[in-house]
Regions:
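Sec-dependent bacterial lipoprotein signal peptides
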Residues: 1-17
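Short, low-complexity N-terminal intrinsically disordered segments enriched in polar/charged residues
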Residues: 19-62, 66, 70
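Short beta-strand edge/turn micro-motifs at domain boundaries
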Residues: 23-27, 142-167
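A solvent-exposed, acidic/Ser-Thr-rich amphipathic alpha-helical stretch
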Residues: 34, 65-114
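Acidic pyrophosphate-coordinating catalytic loop
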Residues: 115-120
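A short hydrophobic beta-strand element
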Residues: 121-131
């Protein structure tokens, strides 16, 4: 074999080996200390749902509550940072209008947003965001929020929210 043939054989072998189907990753069996009461196995989910959550937030900031409400299912439930729960789209819409009409949200940022799907098929968007809430008298308070949005048939059926003041 001459050098040219060896080089062609080497290149062909490299391409063939790199195109070979990789075996599936074997996930280790983990013995958790605490057993999850809901789910403990997720995979990355539908990123279109992240966009829906972002569009809903954009609508709230722009005070376009009708658009914000278009992302909510009729049976939506809001679990708020103060521990209260609001049930039903009409009640959640009323809450959004009352809570956000009297304030401005400034310097809004998203730190983390990702879609996950549980091994039971439940679809979620997890969002870590922050911003400043400015009241009518000009008082500004900054917050970090952590929210989870559960989706069913492309609509939000549950939102769970936590917040803390940002330094």
């Amino acid at each position: 074999m001459n050098l040219k043939q060896i080089l062609v054989l080497f290149l062909f072998s490299s391409v063939f080996i790199s195109c070979e189907k990789k075996s599936e990753e074997v996930k280790p069996n983990v013995n958790y200390i605490y057993e999850a009461t809901y789910l403990d196995t997720f995979k990355m989910g539908n990123s279109d749902l992240v966009l829906k959550v972002q569009q809903m937030h954009e609508s709230i900031i722009k005070k376009d509550y009708e658009s914000a409400g278009s992302y909510l299912a009729d049976n939506v439930e809001f679990r708020l940072e103060d521990g209260s729960t609001i049930e039903g789209k009409d009640n959640c819409m009323k809450f959004m209008v009352e809570a956000y009409s009297a304030v401005e949200i400034e310097d809004y940022n998203v730190a983390v947003n990702l879609a996950v799907t549980g091994d039971n098929g439940d679809e979620w968007v997890l969002l870590w965001d922050n911003g400043s809430v400015v009241t009518e008298d000009g008082t500004s308070s900054s917050f970090n929020w952590m929210e989870s949005f559960q989706f069913e048939n492309g609509k939000i059926i549950m939102m769970n929210q936590f917040s803390k003041p940002r330094n």
